[in-house]
Amino acid sequence: MRAVVLISGGMDSLVVAAQARALGYELAAMHVNYGQRTWQKELTAFRRICSHYAIERKLEVDAAYLEHIGGSSLTDSSIPVEQADLQTVAIPSSYVPFRNASFLSMAVSWSEVIGAERIFIGAVEEDSSGYPDCRKIFYDAFNKVIELGTKPETTIEIRTPLIDLQKSEIVRKGVELDVPFFHSWSCYKSEGKACGLCDSCARRLRAFQLVGLDDPIDYEVRPDYI
């Protein structure tokens, strides 16, 4: 069975790709460039992950319209990337409005064309930044949209195997699957060394710290988040 895996280049999508591969799916990898600050680093990570897992069918999509729409510190240089606050429940400035719906729509289109029956995405609800499009209820609803908006014989279904996990559990899962964490990139701000201070860096560093492992990528600073 064929599956499309959305691979941003980050830790979560890396682990999801490894999970889908371990389940025996023939993988087709999709990466979306949407004008994010670290697009070059993320694209490099995507290509390295695909090479590591010998994924031959790849699609790199240009979604520059999300940059033109703006409204996020990831796509608008006039909005600063906030320093992490792991205690807040507020949606941070890094939220890209309705981004995952755009990504999933493209993944569904491609799945129909290539005959994929599953779409894997590394969404995390339990230990995420509070993004509304990372909730299980959102993906349940989107599966209904797929059912209503595709050909009658289509059997495409979104899978979110990390949705209920903590970030530290995702690290453990990655260790079990022997994933190349050193190929992944999570920083929202920097394309050199990871900043260590943005929300994504903080959650990643905390996860590794909770597991008692060193994150193999380079950081400008490595605060203690536990």
Swiss-Prot record:
Cofactor: Zn(2+)
Stated name of the protein: 7-cyano-7-deazaguanine synthase
Family: Belongs to the QueC family.
Gene3D superfamilies hit by this protein: HUPs
Signal peptide as annotated in the record: none
GO terms (BP aspect): queuosine biosynthetic process
Keyword match Metal-binding: yes
UniProt cofactor note: Binds 1 zinc ion per subunit.
UniProt function note: Catalyzes the ATP-dependent conversion of 7-carboxy-7-deazaguanine (CDG) to 7-cyano-7-deazaguanine (preQ(0)).
Signal as UniProt keyword: no
Pfam families documented for this protein: QueC (PF06508)
Enzyme Commission identifier(s): 6.3.4.20
Origin: domain of life: Bacteria
Involved pathway(s): Purine metabolism; 7-cyano-7-deazaguanine biosynthesis
Source organism of the structure: Chlorobium phaeobacteroides (strain BS1)
Entries under CDD domains matching the protein: QueC-like
